[in-house]
């Protein structure tokens, strides 16, 4: 289980994470400057402002049929977005788009060569300002978008650079970047993780560097248009790939675009240091940033190398509140069968350095179970679970070990309790899918079981007893 400072789980009623919970390489948004409103994938009650312009009429008169042009901001201003996935619906109205494939009044598609949508039909006449038209990423049943407004008003904040991230198994991963539309809207990120939390970052080093951000945005758009060759040509011409941090930013973007191999290439470039920097030690902060990306890319050999260096330096400083890197590395390595011996060594190093804690006992128990020592692994995970029953990773690993060892009734009891306590997260999601456990979140996104579960989990909860497990 991860050290408490680095847990990835969230409750079932999760909202936009606080700035304090975001990765250190992102600065929090200034509350005195901006406000962000989260848009969820609900078919009704859309509240975002429009983002398209009509092309069917010379003057924008109300009409029941029209086509819109997806206009996106970039470093040079607004421009049509050809061959780009989009999402469009009638904003804040009792009316809806007719004949959509899903019947929910929301139309998904890809713009044509001029950036236009398909023809849209509605029951009532509308102007272009009655629609919300935004770029779309992904094609899952769950989704999010944001709208930026100036602090203290409903005035939108257009052309503002942003990055959206989502917690994954091994860290906070970029899922999109770009500029807000003229109505302050981000793209719509569509995914298949039930109740997955998405964060918006608008005040970071990468968003403040306008020239470099524009280069990343251009590459992102090419990949969104399914133009991999065009994206690679832009990467080859980029100027912002000189520093290690710029290379890591590009690697994060490439991972978001589904280009993991190319992302690994740029991650490895950060380890090729030019003369005379090659003779200087890598700064701890830079190594930590590199370690974050190595974890996201699933590179256990590099994670182990960088973690060991940081642990050695950490032991010299003896910081009482330092992250337990040995435990976190052990938990990461447990996902790679060939690295289980190193994982166990790291887990035992954690217990030796900081003493037995619920989280590192849970980590060692999980690793021992994976190495065939199921009884001892379950004993340690039981101790961890009694102290941290609402930790989604402990609930996932302990329950999954019980289930794999044939104790399926006990695993079901544990997960029933987690469901009652509204425990949820990406790891628990994967474990329940493997076991075929019938969780409410495995129903359609706007179904009655999902809505009822969300409503219940939004209420105050009382900690349940766990002694029987």
Positions of predicted regions on the chain:
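Short, acidic Ser/Thr/Gly-rich low-complexity loop/linker segments typical of extracellular
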Residues: 96-116, 170-185
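Alpha-solenoid helical repeat scaffolds
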Residues: 216-217, 248-249, 281-289, 324-328, ...
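Residue-level recognition of tetratricopeptide repeat
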Residues: 220, 252, 292, 331-332, ...
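Short coil turns that delineate tetratricopeptide repeat
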Residues: 241-243, 275, 320, 355, ...
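Alpha-helical adaptor scaffolds
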Residues: 323-387
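Terminal, low-structured helical/coil segments at or just beyond the last alpha-helical repeat
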Residues: 412-469
């Amino acid at each position: 289980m991860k050290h408490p400072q680095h847990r990835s789980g969230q409750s079932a009623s999760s909202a936009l994470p606080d700035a304090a919970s975001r990765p250190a390489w992102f600065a929090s948004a200034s509350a005195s400057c901006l406000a962000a409103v989260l848009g969820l994938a609900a078919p009704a009650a859309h509240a975002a402002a429009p983002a398209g312009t009509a092309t069917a009429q010379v003057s924008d008169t109300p009409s029941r049929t029209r086509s819109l042009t997806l206009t996106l901001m970039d470093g040079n201003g607004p421009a049509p977005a050809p061959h780009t996935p989009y999402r469009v619906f009638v904003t804040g109205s009792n009316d809806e788009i007719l004949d959509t494939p899903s019947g929910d009044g929301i139309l998904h598609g890809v713009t044509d060569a001029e950036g236009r949508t398909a023809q849209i039909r509605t029951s009532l006449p509308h102007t272009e300002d009655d629609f919300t038209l935004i770029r779309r990423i992904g094609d899952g049943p769950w989704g999010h978008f944001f709208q930026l407004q100036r602090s203290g008003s409903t005035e939108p904040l257009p052309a503002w650079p942003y990055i959206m991230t989502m917690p994954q198994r091994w860290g906070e991963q970029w899922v999109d970047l770009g500029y807000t539309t003229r109505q302050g809207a981000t793209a719509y990120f569509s995914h298949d993780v039930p109740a997955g939390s998405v964060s918006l970052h608008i005040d970071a080093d990468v968003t403040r560097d306008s020239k470099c951000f524009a280069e990343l945005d251009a590459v992102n758009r090419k990949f969104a248009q399914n133009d991999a060759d065009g994206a690679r040509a832009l990467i080859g011409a980029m100027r912002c790939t000189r520093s290690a941090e710029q290379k890591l930013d590009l690697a994060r973007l490439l991972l978001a675009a589904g280009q993991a191999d190319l992302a690994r290439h740029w991650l490895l470039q950060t380890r090729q240091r030019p003369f005379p920097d090659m003779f200087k030690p890598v700064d701890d902060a830079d190594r930590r940033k590199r370690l974050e990306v190595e974890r996201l890319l699933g590179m256990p050999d590099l994670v182990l190398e960088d973690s060991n260096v940081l642990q050695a330096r950490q032991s010299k400083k003896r910081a009482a509140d330092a992250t337990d890197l040995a435990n976190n590395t052990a938990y990461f390595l447990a996902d790679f069968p060939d690295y289980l011996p190193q994982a166990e060594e790291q887990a035992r190093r954690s217990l030796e350095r900081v003493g037995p804690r619920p989280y590192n006992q849970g980590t060692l128990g999980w690793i021992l179970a994976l190495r065939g020592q199921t009884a001892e692994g379950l004993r340690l995970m039981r101790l961890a679970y009694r102290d941290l029953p609402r930790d989604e990773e402990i609930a996932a690993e302990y329950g999954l070990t019980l289930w794999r060892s044939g104790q399926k009734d006990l695993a079901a009891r544990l997960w029933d309790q987690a469901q009652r306590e509204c425990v949820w997260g990406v790891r628990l999601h994967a474990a329940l899918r493997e076991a075929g456990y019938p969780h409410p979140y495995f129903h359609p996104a706007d179904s009655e079981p999902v809505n009822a579960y969300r409503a219940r989990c939004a209420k105050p909860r009382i900690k349940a007893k766990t002694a029987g497990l």
